[in-house]
Every structure is written in structure tokens, then in C-alpha cells.
Amino acid sequence: RYGIASMAHTQTQAMVMGADEFAAENIETNNSNVETAYTAYYNVINAVNTFLVHINKNIPGLSEEKRTEMIAEARCQRALAYLTLLKCFGEYWKQDSPYGVCIFQDELVRDNQPRKRSSVAETYKLISDDLDYAIAHCEQQPADHYHMSSVFAKALKAKMYMAQDNYAEAARLAEEVISEAEAAGYGLESDYAKIFDEQFNSQEMLFAPYTANPSELMDSNWYMFSPGSLLKKVADDLVPDDETGGDIVIPNPGDGGDVVVPDPDGSSDGSASGDGGVVIPGGDGGVVIPGGDGGVVIPGGDGSDFPFFPGDEDVASYDKLYTWAYKGDAMNGIGKYNKLTPEMFYADSYYFMRLAEVYYIAAEAEARQGQYAKARTLLATVIERAGYTEDDVNAIADSDLLGEILKHKLCDMSNENLEEWFDLCRYNRKGGFESWTEDEKAELPSFRRYLLPIPKASMGANSLLVQNPEYVNQ
């Protein structure tokens, strides 16, 4: 996932083997990260198929209702694995393509069995069948969000339809999920930071694995990396226009002393707010802020963004949501991943799907069908917590709406579940970048290839496996 984020330019090159190949969109067939991911998803499929063999045996004390529910959750996990494999390694956007993935439905993945790739249509058929079973038989109201529910299965199928460019069905299912969410125990968090503090316990989480201190946790390497050029540019451009205070001018402190930041809502000395401005301790002159011609200019916000820390560029003027997505509150790295263990290590879960993503799916799907009023209502709901009002959303022109939906989704959801890459590829294929500025477009990937290569080791172990056309000569 780190490599995919590098490829999407939502994260700088990760400190993992071969990540530079992702950033350059020039991935070798022997890339170790690609091989690890490919193998890992088939390990999930193998585990599911093994479980399905044994769960159908006579197990004392197991009711048929519980057996069916467990089968449904297992099949939902298999659907998630196959959908991810197809989107990473198959021509998922072409319904008539022969380049799906190798399917193991009722048998185990072992012994290097030669296996042809199934077509894209055949792969989608298996995914759809598994999800339909999960929608019908998974728990409706799970006590824990680390279990797959019927609502999650339906949300995952909406995502599947977006991959197929089937916007009508994507919108229909996504809006069903939204209408059913509250009764099933899901909801948007009003505080964005709470999502990543509560992790799999957040009401917004449709599915995230159980990871808990002290013995079961997942290292949060995201925090160690930095947002990519595309994410930073989009976040910069989404900072609302200043309407209240103008630019904030910090007087040059000269040699030492405190730096006094005038309150942008009041007079230059901060008297309107009664607090005398915002003070950044200067001590013996150790706080160095370039003064230029006598003052330091920081782009203005609404007067409520301080205190901030020197050196964080213009992070102080971000809305709360995009502050966390972009840089964090005076943090380096991807600040939403800030969960600490008692041993002071960063640890987190893996956020496979949040309810917010369902709103973005529905909003984009409606906009692509020309249903702009519906799209605006959906977008306004999910970005309200970032400080955007219904009036802000209504001011977006129809021709700009698709582009704005993606910008907000990038800031909200990048560096979580690979989806930003697939979103960018869809916009490149189907349109939506037209309203972006030239500076924003300059930060987009080149889209040389939409897919990853089938790993060289897998090709060598399976005589019937065919490489993706873009990588045949590598």
C-alpha cells in the first residue's frame, strides 16, 4: 500500500524496498513489495477456502444460523481479496478483458497448481456472488467493527460497481448503505481526529482489523512518511478564502524576545480579543522566523487557527480535517496516524473502508449521471466537519463538481486503502480533472500504466499464467 500511495503522489517515497519504482511508475516484475502483496491476498483466499471446507463439517454446538453467518463473513473476506487483486493486477475497467486473475473458488491455493487467468467478467462474477451472500447473511448490527457486516458487504459492492464504471448501481447501493448505517451502528464522526484515535471502535469504521495493545497491534508506518506533492497541492488549494482577517503579519522580533502574533480578528495589537495576540516564546532568540522587510506574512484564516509552530509553513490556516490529512497539528509525517502505544510506539489499524468513503462514492456516481443536486447534498454532508457549509457546496459549478469531490476525498481518505490510485485512474479515463488548475494537474501521475505486474516468481511457478501486456517485455 505504501508503493501505491507513492505512485498516486499522495505520499513521498516510502522507506520500503522498491518504492522508488512506484513513484516513477516503472515497476519491475521482481519488485519484492508487489510479490509480497500478491502472495498475501492469495493467502487470505487460501485461508477462506480452507475455513469453508471445515465449517461445513459436523461441529457440535454450532447452530446452522451461526454457521451461515460465519460462512458469509468468510466469503466477504474472499470478495475483498479478489477485488483488490483484480484492481491491482487485472484490467478491472474492461468488462470484456481476458486479463482477470487466477480464481480458486472451492479448492485450496497450494502445490503450485498451474492455473489460467480467469476473465475480468468471471472474476467479477465470483466477487459479486460472494458479496450477495454476505449481504444476505452477515450480521446486520455487529457489536464490533472488526467484523464484516451486511452493511460493509453492500458498501464493498458499491465500490465494485465504481470499478466497473456502473454509476447507477454504485449510487443505488451507496445510498442504501447511508440510509441503513445509523440503525446498524455506523455514523460519521463529527471530529475527524476521533476516527484514528478510536480506530476499529470508531462509529465511522465499516471494517478495520482488530488491533489492540499490548500484544496485537499493527505498526503505523504511515506516520513515518510525508504527504506527497499531489496531496499537498490539493490541500493548499482547498484552504478557504480569507473573509475575516486578511493576512496575518508577524512583526519582526529582531534579536531575541518573544514573537507576538497579532490576532487576525482584532487590531494589530490583538486588543479586540483581549488576549494581546498570540505569543510564541522566543527566549534568547532561538526562534528564528525570517523577517524580510520587517514582518513575516502567513496566509490568513478565520482567526481561530492558532497557536501554530514555526516551520510548519502555512499549516496554521488549514481546516481541522485537512490539517490532519496534510501535515498534522505541528507534526511531520501523515498526522492522522498518531496513535501511541504505552511503549510510545506508533501503532494503528488498517482502515479498509469508512462510511465517509460511501458518501464520496455516491456523490461522484450521482455527479457522473448529471444528478448534481443529489451529489451536492452528499458532498455537503461529509465535508461539513471540515468547516464547509451547504452554501460553499452550492457555489460549486456543475462543471467543477466532479473535480471538487475528488479533491475533498483525497484530503479525507488518502493513504488508507489504496483507493486514491484507482480514483485517479478513473478520473483520467472518464474525466473530472477539467476544473483543476494547471498547477494541480502538474502533480498528477503520468498514468503510464494502471496495473501492477504479475510477480516474476509467480510467473515462474505457474506455466499457464500470462503477464499483463504492459509488462511483457520486462
Regions found by a protein language model. Name each.
Residues 14-89, 118, 136-141, 345-350, ...:
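Conserved, well-structured interaction surfaces
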Residues 65, 88-125:
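Short coil/linker segments at helix-helix boundaries
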Residues 171-258, 262-269, 274-286, 291-355, ...:
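Hydrophobic-face positions in mid-chain alpha helices that act as interaction patches
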